[in-house]
């Protein structure tokens, strides 16, 4: 996909030089100084609050390891709405540092689904921008630059522990019923020890020095004050032994160098904030405002997953949902404007959205309500657009020979009230074109029709068809049908349900459906206009009356068991 090519790397914001006053919070400098400071490293307290001022810049940063989940789509939407409401920028960044799971196909699928949904990004893949590139896999040189700066400042040190040593630390911690945190084996190593391991070619990681006591607090725009005890966090890795940076380090560097002002993301990322805040402090960057959105839950209040049905945007698109309905519904999962209104366009959401009205409690995903909402949006479309969407669907499905025209317009008008999803239109038209007369007459619901003398109505209806009287009336459209039905009722001395229920069964083969007059006129026109594919299961008027003529009414007697021949043609 040419439009998804990497953006040029126009500009990268470099970190300022770290000041001694900041770095005194960490062990740094030469060995003797480091030993002295480390011995006094007992307590650390910082209140992490975002820098004020500047333009609003938010980002959505999906990992291309699968499809765009509705939870991710909602996060993207909230970021977009906040940016537009504040006159800011919405940035899309691809976090593809998981080399084993990230694929180009997944990235393209995510971008395609997000484009279909509607929130347009201002910077990112396919668009570019001055803070690119916008794929983490293309920013490795930047991560290494910052890792080296942290190493030089003493905020990071080389750790030569093997996997076996790390596993042993975990086992000991487990036996002592302690958190499985790194013990700091290489945190206070001498320069001679480090040089010796480097000379031997021992693999190493970069570990970030974490104060052993104290706490860290942030002001979350949704959850309020959130705090962590630092003694629960050991020195953590920011760069693996293969030179690949770790997620939390990449995210912090990217958000800082892309001038992200607000980080709006799912609450499952809240634990990552502790590590990221420490890295921000070490690099001397002002922190963004954080807002952690609650998870989307299944009806049983568990985390929404594949076992609950469709969960990705692409699945809902393929099922026949409209993007505007998805946007409307996702916005209401955890947000509301304080009124009873449930229907919003994307433009209206931009006008109404505030982060203060986002709830901290989990939102239940109700697929039934989503389907209902989609039907409301579908039926509110301008008739030209609705005809185009459904007409194309019918043609692509091999039911209609054309995607537009009088037949399409009339069929959409007749059937739209029973269509909630675009895909429902196929079943609706196929059902309309079918003629399950025998099945209906043989059903329990068909018994009252038989008892009401439907066979006598059938004889008169056949006579009207054979004479050309019915066809002539239907050729005139709805007015012709109404005039004919009125006269037909007088002839049989029937009216209302007594007239139209047997007519519905005899003409459509069904007990229920849309207006019988409009249905009959449409079926007649379908047979004369060539608008329906012959192989689409359409039973023409000639075929219907042929079937009707062959019905053995005595076989449907309520006092006699039905024979096999009575329910088959």
Curated annotation (Swiss-Prot):
Record keyword Aminoacyl-tRNA synthetase present: yes
PANTHER family xrefs: GLUTAMATE--TRNA LIGASE, GLUTAMATE--TRNA LIGASE, MITOCHONDRIAL-RELATED
PROSITE patterns: AA_TRNA_LIGASE_I (PS00178)
Cellular component, GO annotation: chloroplast; mitochondrion
Its biological purpose: Catalyzes the attachment of glutamate to tRNA(Glu) in a two-step reaction: glutamate is first activated by ATP to form Glu-AMP and then transferred to the acceptor end of tRNA(Glu).
EC number(s) recorded for this UniProt protein: 6.1.1.17
GO biological process: glutamyl-tRNA aminoacylation; post-embryonic development; reproductive structure development
Class in the EC hierarchy, top level: ligase
Family, similarity comment: Belongs to the class-I aminoacyl-tRNA synthetase family. Glutamate--tRNA ligase type 1 subfamily.
Protein name: Glutamate--tRNA ligase, chloroplastic/mitochondrial
Motif ('HIGH' region): 62-72
Source organism, top-level taxon: Eukaryota
Residue positions of motif 'KMSKS' region: 303-307
Positions annotated to bind ATP: 69, 268, 303-307
Keywords associated with the record: Aminoacyl-tRNA synthetase, ATP-binding, Chloroplast, Ligase, Mitochondrion, Nucleotide-binding, Plastid, Protein biosynthesis, RNA-binding, Transit peptide
Pfam family, one: tRNA-synt_1c
Keyword Nucleotide-binding on entry: yes
Compartment list: Plastid, Chloroplast; Mitochondrion
Molecular function in Gene Ontology: ATP binding; glutamate-tRNA ligase activity; tRNA binding; zinc ion binding
Reaction equations catalysed: tRNA(Glu) + L-glutamate + ATP = L-glutamyl-tRNA(Glu) + AMP + diphosphate
Residues that bind L-glutamate: 59-61, 95, 247-251, 265
Paired cysteines (S-S): none
